Amino acid sequence: MTAMTIKDLKVRLEAVSSLSDPFFEELKADKRLGVQKAVSSRKRALEAILKEEARLEAMLTYEQALYQKGFQAIAGIDEVGRGPLAGPIVAACVILPKGCTIKGLNDSKKIPKAKHEAIYQAIQKKALGIGLGIIDNHTIDRVNIYEATKLAMIAAINQLKGSVSKPDYLLIDAMTLEVPIPQQAIIKGDASSMSIAAASIVAKVTRDRLMLDYDKAFPGYGFAKNAGYGTKEHLQGLHQYGITPIHRQSFEPIKSMTLR
């Protein structure tokens, strides 16, 4: 064993996919520090992979229970954009195949923005159906953000497109909808349900793209970076350039600005 270079050992370790692989036991006899460091590194990597696989499997708990009850087209629903001062609220409805997991999927707020697009594309490839609901700032001002959220979610259900476009059960992130479909509201569902997490990413990427377009139409507010949230740059833009057609006039400080 000692005849093998550490470089060659590292290459072979990369091919090891199980913590019970006998190669680890063989390497115990090799006392070289570089070898033992490589072994520890590979074991940590495998432990991280197992932990991630277990997390993803746990995110199918709600879906698996529903499959056992006979439901087939289970849709996850989530929204993005309740808090911003500008732009629409966007909801997505996603139906995934039975037992489908998507690498790296989680609540969109817990995923680095650089990874959003790749996960979004993976969802687009695997999903049986995807629907979007987009409610603009004018409607938000007219009905309030809570009601606008429900409108966006219902629109997303109605806009489902794909090989499966009629869900027989809804898993919704912390909301109940007045639709004739069995449903369950799950607190923090975007972190505990694969279907809701998929909807979270689809809604997030869709809204971010819209805000990029708005950044070009209304420069000076930082919409490309802040997505309409009330950052320092955004508030400075409001002070310097005023209110745009996409600002929510029922939200402060815009509401007070309209009264001056």
From Swiss-Prot:
Q: Does this UniProt record's set of keywords contain Repeat?
A: no
Q: Which reaction does it catalyse?
A: Endonucleolytic cleavage to 5'-phosphomonoester
Q: Which GO terms describe its molecular function?
A: manganese ion binding; RNA binding; RNA-DNA hybrid ribonuclease activity
SUPFAM superfamilies per UniProt: Ribonuclease H-like (SSF53098)
Q: Domain RNase H type-2: where?
A: 72-260
Gene3D superfamilies in the record, alphabetically? Ribonuclease H-like superfamily/Ribonuclease H (3.30.420.10)
Cofactor binding notes? Manganese or magnesium. Binds 1 divalent metal ion per monomer in the absence of substrate. May bind a second metal ion after substrate binding.
**One protein family per Pfam:** RNase_HII
Q: Does the keyword Acetylation apply?
A: no
Q: Which cofactor does it need?
A: Mn(2+); Mg(2+)
GO BP: DNA replication, removal of RNA primer; mismatch repair
Q: Name one GO cellular component term.
A: ribonuclease H2 complex
Which purpose does this protein serve, as stated in its record? Endonuclease that specifically degrades the RNA of RNA-DNA hybrids.
Q: What is the protein name for this chain?
A: Ribonuclease HII
Q: Which organism is it from?
A: Streptococcus equi subsp. zooepidemicus (strain MGCS10565)
Q: Where is the organism placed in the taxonomic lineage, from the top?
A: Bacteria, Bacillati, Bacillota, Bacilli, Lactobacillales
Q: Which gene encodes it?
A: rnhB
